[in-house]
Amino acid sequence: MQKLRVFLLALAALCISCEAKYFATNCELVHELRRQGFPEDKMRDWVCLIQNESGRNTSKMGTINKNGSRDYGLFQINDKYWCSKTSTPGKDCNVTCAEMLLDDITKASKCAKKIYKRHKFQAWYGWRNHCQGTLPDISKC
């Protein structure tokens, strides 16, 4: 029991030290997406998707969906297919959902690209409902 208590305290301390990232502007987000290797020709789509899915906040956890699943992080990656709710990486992206909430978006970006490769932007309701034909101007970024 004592070992469990120590482990939980260490885990809590680790979580406190992990801060989520909020991208204050579209340009700040664009610079990070470029760093992550997102293609320029789809950049406006990615920015719009992220604005509408997570509000540019890596720590965003969606409400529980009708099917019992939940969406996580900047790209709102779903735990039914893509990330594992346990501490063991799994599902199609071989990551934990907790990793989707980190300020380092490397794993979340890789997973989002995998989702896009399979389903394009249609995989995200935020893009479907708000971005088709209405993309942000990022020309000054």
UniProtKB/Swiss-Prot annotation:
Disulfide bonds listed in the record: 27-141, 48-131, 83-97, 93-111
Active-site annotation: 53, 71
Signal peptide region: 1-20
Keyword Secreted set for record: no
The family this protein is said to belong to: Belongs to the glycosyl hydrolase 22 family.
Membrane-spanning ranges: none
Organism: Trichoplusia ni (Cabbage looper)
SUPFAM superfamilies on file: Lysozyme-like (SSF53955)
Boundaries of every C-type lysozyme domain copy: 21-141
Name this polypeptide is given: Lysozyme
Enzyme class: hydrolase
